[in-house]
């Protein structure tokens, strides 16, 4: 595309402390959130005739970690197609050459609120169990592609007023190091599983713990384990659930085990004490959902030893959840992620930049040709 024509397609607008340079089809930009990975605006898309969310990745090429994360997010968003994971509608950059390339914009479906806002609401059993069912469906879909999230939290889950739910991100890369004795940095750890906090090996049900913490917060209206760092996080967990068995301790590496074994021992509380009936909504006549079922599910999800914690599939079959069971949602075809080494490869910032630029150009080519993999036919007509 020639430079002048391309420049005419874009305009710049200040949004908060940032400048967005976007295609003219996107109007009425309003800031709706910001995080470590970027600033998000709502906008009206005149081509699709709908409201959308536009995320500007924040300084994606400032270092290898940022560049690698940007590449991973873009590649995964392009591949994943499930109703409980946010859908990618467009990708663009206003820059014209690889040398100039510095900004990446992702256009996504716009939702009404994140789960932090929903937690403050009085939810009945139907809504609570339906939201949990959708979280489990979305996570199962990621697991089918070999993506284990490890960092699910309310701020990264969005909902619409009709109670539909979508997961916004893909969590920690496989190579992201975590651990009890590591230098703390600013990040929400309240929902991270013990095996992540303690730097152990993990399996897919690491995400079941996070969903259990989110469910507990929806029931209680407050965070279950509000740790200030990994060590405090572990203390909060054992104060409530009790010190785990010696069998569990033997799975820890020596330095972590020494620390953990020297903590005071806690008996913990029963789930009846942690989640008394008074915290739950009234029993549901319609789907026969009860506080006792919800509490039973919590007691199976919030198990410190992952080998004794239920799996995503078992959670989906639990009486509190399986009233919504639909094979087309639970067993949706897995995403075709060809790059199995997505997290393992190491590149320089310049190499990551070139890989990301190629992905953006490939998207532009596909949209020009009316082919957007994994998107409904109506969206395949999008022109730049």
UniProtKB/Swiss-Prot annotation:
One of its GO terms (biological process) is JNK cascade. Activated by threonine and tyrosine phosphorylation. CDD domains: STKc_JNK. Its cofactor is Mg(2+). Its EC number is 2.7.11.24. The modification Phosphotyrosine is found at residue 185. It catalyses: L-seryl-[protein] + ATP = O-phospho-L-seryl-[protein] + ADP + H(+); L-threonyl-[protein] + ATP = O-phospho-L-threonyl-[protein] + ADP + H(+). A motif (TXY) lies at residues 183-185. Residues 26-321 form the Protein kinase domain. One of its GO terms (cellular component) is cytoplasm. It comes from the Eukaryota. The active site is at 151 (proton acceptor). This is Mitogen-activated protein kinase 8.
């Amino acid at each position: 595309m020639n430079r002048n024509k391309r420049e005419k397609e874009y305009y710049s607008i200040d949004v908060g402390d940032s400048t967005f340079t976007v295609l003219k089809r996107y109007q009425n930009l309003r800031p709706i959130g910001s995080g470590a990975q970027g600033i998000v605006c709502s906008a009206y898309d005149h081509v699709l005739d709908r409201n959308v969310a536009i995320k500007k990745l924040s300084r994606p090429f400032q270092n290898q970690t940022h560049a690698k994360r940007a590449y991973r997010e873009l590649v995964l968003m392009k591949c994943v197609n499930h109703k409980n994971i946010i859908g990618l509608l467009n990708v663009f950059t206003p820059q014209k050459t690889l040398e100039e390339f510095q900004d990446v914009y992702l256009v996504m479906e716009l939702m009404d609120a994140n789960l932090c806002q929903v937690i403050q609401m009085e939810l009945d059993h139907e809504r609570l169990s339906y939201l949990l069912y959708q979280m489990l469906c979305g996570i199962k879909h990621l697991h089918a592609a070999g993506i284990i999230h490890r960092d699910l939290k309310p701020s990264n889950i969005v909902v619409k007023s009709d109670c539909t739910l979508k997961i916004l991100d893909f969590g920690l890369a496989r190579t992201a190091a975590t651990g009890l004795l590591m230098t703390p940095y600013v990040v929400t750890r309240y929902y991270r599983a013990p095996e992540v906090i303690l730097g152990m090996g993990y399996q897919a049900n690491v995400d079941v713990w996070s969903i259990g913490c989110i469910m507990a917060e929806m029931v209680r209206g407050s965070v279950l384990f509000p740790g200030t760092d990994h060590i405090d996080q572990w203390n909060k967990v054992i104060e409530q659930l009790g010190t785990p068995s010696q069998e569990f301790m033997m799975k820890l590496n020596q330095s972590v085990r020494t620390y953990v074994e020297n903590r005071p021992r806690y008996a913990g509380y029963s789930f009846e004490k942690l989640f008394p009936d008074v915290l739950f909504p009234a029993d549901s006549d319609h789907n026969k959902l009860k506080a006792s079922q919800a509490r039973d599910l919590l007691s199976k999800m919030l198990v410190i030893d992952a080998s004794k914690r239920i799996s995503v599939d078992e959670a989906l079959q639990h009486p509190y959840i399986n009233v919504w069971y639909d094979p087309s949602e639970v067993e949706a075809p897995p995403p075709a992620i060809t790059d199995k080494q997505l997290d393992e490869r190491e590149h320089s910032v310049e190499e990551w930049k070139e890989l990301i630029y190629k992905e953006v150009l490939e998207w532009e080519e596909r949209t020009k040709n009316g082919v957007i993999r994994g998107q409904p036919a109506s969206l395949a007509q999008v022109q730049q």
